[in-house]
């Protein structure tokens, strides 16, 4: 994924009804469609957290999806993004669900 454009990395946490509604599976599918890498997992406090990396415009598309769309049965109350930074190379080769 060497695009010549800056690569971005951002951590996220999604709040709402996001567990037990296939949120991680849909997140993995959407990330692969958009073309970003990283990971997603459930937390013990009922949220979904993870990291996204890729070209800035693709990361922004994924941020929008994580904030507004989600899985069909989910209800997103809010999404927090943190540690957004420019990176020199991707730290992951694909997007995966972590357990």
UniProtKB/Swiss-Prot annotation:
It catalyses: an acyl phosphate + H2O = a carboxylate + phosphate + H(+). The modification N-acetylserine is found at residue 2. Residues 9-99 form the Acylphosphatase-like domain. The modification Phosphoserine is found at residue 93. InterPro entries: Acylphosphatase, Acylphosphatase-like_dom, Acylphosphatase-like_dom_sf, Acylphosphatase_CS. The keyword Oxidoreductase does not apply. Its physiological role is not yet clear. This is Acylphosphatase-2.
